[in-house]
Amino acid sequence: PASQLLDSDKTIYYERAAFSIDIPTVFETIMGNKLNLSIVGVRAYNQMNLYSKKSPELFRLAIGFKNQVCCNMCIFTDGYKEDLRVTSTNGLYRAALELFNNFNPARQLQLLHSLGNTTMNEHQFCQILGKMRLYQCLPNYYQRNIPKMLLTDTQINSVAKAYINDENFSSFGEDINMWKFYNLLTGANKSSYIDSFLDRSLNTTKLALGINAALHGDERYKWFID
């Protein structure tokens, strides 16, 4: 019976594990920051049915770029598989190769470079943070008409603090470029649990690129800057 199990005998269902493999021979420099190609994987028991012997094993796998200045991860849609279910190591190998082959690093680096070409003033920055805080309180029907924003209130507060104090990306008292803004978002995401880290990494990329486009007149993320 479970009541007679020692602590060392008990299975901990909320255990999470992650790995990160850098490929330093594939790199790019953006705004003075070196980015290495990186492969990241997550395994979370709390998202699996541990009682079933025949159910596929669940993994999350991503390939993207890691900012070597701060270890922030840049994840893109074509480089992320959030629900990779396999029944063998061969299946995992094939799924990983398929993900890697579909990833377009040149396109993603071009998008990251473009962030450095756009700046916003302090008022615009505060407006965006205010909208991000407001997003959390919106009714579900309203949120459905706005692009997703997955950062928590605590993480948004971290973005505000880093804007003032971060040694690499602070811009207090001056205009902030979108590359720095993006890294404030990805930096705040490092406080996420392992099993939500990659989802939020992708979301911060979409947010930064979407808000960048909105500053140039695009409508989709316009709500965050209005």
Protein language model regions, located:
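Intrinsically disordered, low-complexity regions enriched in serine/threonine
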Residues: L5-D226
